[in-house]
Amino acid sequence: MSLRDKLDAYLRLARMDRPIGTFLLLWPCLMALVLAAGGMPDLKVLIIFVIGVVVMRACGCIINDYADRKLDSHVERTKSRPLASGEVTVKEALILFVVMGLLAFGLVLMLNPLVVQLSFVGIILTIIYPFTKRFTNMPQMFLGVVWSWSIPMAYAAQLGTVPVEAWWLFAANWCWTVAYDTMYAMVDRDDDLKVGIKSTAILFGRFDRQIIGLFQLAALGCFIMAGLSADRGLVFALGILTFIGFGLYQQKLIFDRERAPCLQAFLNNNWAGMVLFVTLGADYLI
């Protein structure tokens, strides 16, 4: 394999070719920074968190593929991943994970001690998550914690503390993550049943759409509370209304539980998150 092909495999292992996960991590993180700052966050903190989201998402993808390397070859969507296909060795993947982890830790060292302390919890959660799919039917609920951990870290970086209001946004993102990652799990449900991978899509069974709807409603309520606790106004309210529209559209997409529309519903959440962030930021400007 040429150096160019090897570098391409490393980039795909870190999902640099599929930024959807980075965006889904980024929007709530940016919302947390804006809410904590009451508008424009500190530029240094903003840059560190944007880079940190990219790096930690890569870490999560690498350790996930390491954990699933023997199973991914049996799943249609994942059989071409670099570890499953043999393009990247286990040793290479672990080295890349350590390098990315050290880079992320170097970033948080530029922030206050509370952020550093919270970062240790974050990396532990990131390492544990991929293995939860073997022991629990609710790995999406654990993922919700992992993908929401940047929120208290963002508040801590901006304020030096994590106020009660931060947990409304944390709860909102947790519920939202469970909802959209269950949509994602619906894509792989048949393959997961064959290889023994557990998920909320399997756990919820024929009630999957209804339970996803309940999580979407819970996320909506918590996003509203996060906005109210920060005295947000009409522009953010318009973002909330748009978020409702996205949720209804996603319910339509997953109605027949077909793979392609379920994947489309998952991907649509990027736009929902972007609208929430943009309207929140605009609400502070207007």
From Swiss-Prot:
Listed transmembrane segments: 20-40, 43-63, 95-115, 116-136, 142-162, 167-187, 210-230, 235-255
Pfam annotation, one family: UbiA
Source organism: Shewanella loihica (strain ATCC BAA-1088 / PV-4)
UniProt superkingdom: Bacteria
Topology of this chain in the membrane: Multi-pass membrane protein
Protein's job: Catalyzes the prenylation of para-hydroxybenzoate (PHB) with an all-trans polyprenyl group. Mediates the second step in the final reaction sequence of ubiquinone-8 (UQ-8) biosynthesis, which is the condensation of the polyisoprenoid side chain with PHB, generating the first membrane-bound Q intermediate 3-octaprenyl-4-hydroxybenzoate.
Catalytic activity line of the entry: all-trans-octaprenyl diphosphate + 4-hydroxybenzoate = 4-hydroxy-3-(all-trans-octaprenyl)benzoate + diphosphate
Gene that encodes it: ubiA
Tagged with keyword Membrane: yes
Keywords for this protein: Cell inner membrane, Cell membrane, Magnesium, Membrane, Transferase, Transmembrane, Transmembrane helix, Ubiquinone biosynthesis
Keyword Hydrolase: no
Stated name of the protein: 4-hydroxybenzoate octaprenyltransferase
Family membership: Belongs to the UbiA prenyltransferase family.
